[in-house]
């Protein structure tokens, strides 16, 4: 079982979340003939302490969603929408405690739809970031870029993989994923 988990964790992590970029700045008619400018959302820099126990996040069909800017409702609405959408900056998506993806501001990494990927060490003391970045983050066991797996997601799902989003199915049974999720050692906040 331990060997299966060691093989399954990196595979699951490489296939997990999603991403999409928003627009830069737009100029809109404000209704009175004048123009107003809206700008891209400010970027967010993630620290190890930003990653919480999965049980502190909102579960959606087997993965977990949070937002570091307090936009949990907006992030969950995108995750639950059958039509997809673009996740707000600061959205955290995790399938298992050892990997995460965080939506960054437009321009962070267009190749990964502006998602930053993380490999994590989750312990009872908290989380340590092992690796982070865009499409260069590689799953240690599969040797594949996290972004390469997520790029198969249909565009409307913002780089988030699920059974109906165009991605290859995970080569790990759901019960193994659930057992990894339930073994998250991080304390609740």
Q: Across the structure, where does each feature detected by a protein language model lie?
A:
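C-terminal motif of bacterial Sec signal peptides marking the signal peptidase cleavage site
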Residues: 15-18
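Bacterial N-terminal signal peptides that target proteins for export
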Residues: 1-9
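Sequence context surrounding c-type heme c attachment/ligation sites in exported
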Residues: 22, 41, 48, 84-189
């Amino acid at each position: 079982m331990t060997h299966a988990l060691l093989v399954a964790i990196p595979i699951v992590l490489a296939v997990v979340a999603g991403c999409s970029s928003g627009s830069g700045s737009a100029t809109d008619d404000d209704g009175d003939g004048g123009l107003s400018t809206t700008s891209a959302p400010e970027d967010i820099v993630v620290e190890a302490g930003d990653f919480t126990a999965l049980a502190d996040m909102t579960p959606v069909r087997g993965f977990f969603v949070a937002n570091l800017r307090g936009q949990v409702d907006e992030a969950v609405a995108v995750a639950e929408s059958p039509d997809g959408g673009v996740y707000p900056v600061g959205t955290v998506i995790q399938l298992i405690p050892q990997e995460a993806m965080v939506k960054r501001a437009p321009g962070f990494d267009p190749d990964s739809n502006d998602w930053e990927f993380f490999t994590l060490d989750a312990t009872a003391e908290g989380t340590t970031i092992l690796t982070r970045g865009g499409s260069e983050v590689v799953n240690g066991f599969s040797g594949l870029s996290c972004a390469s797996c997520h790029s198969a997601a249909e565009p409307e799902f913002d780089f988030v993989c699920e059974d109906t989003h165009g991605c290859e199915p995970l080569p790990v049974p759901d019960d193994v994923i659930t057992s990894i999720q339930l073994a998250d050692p991080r304390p609740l906040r």
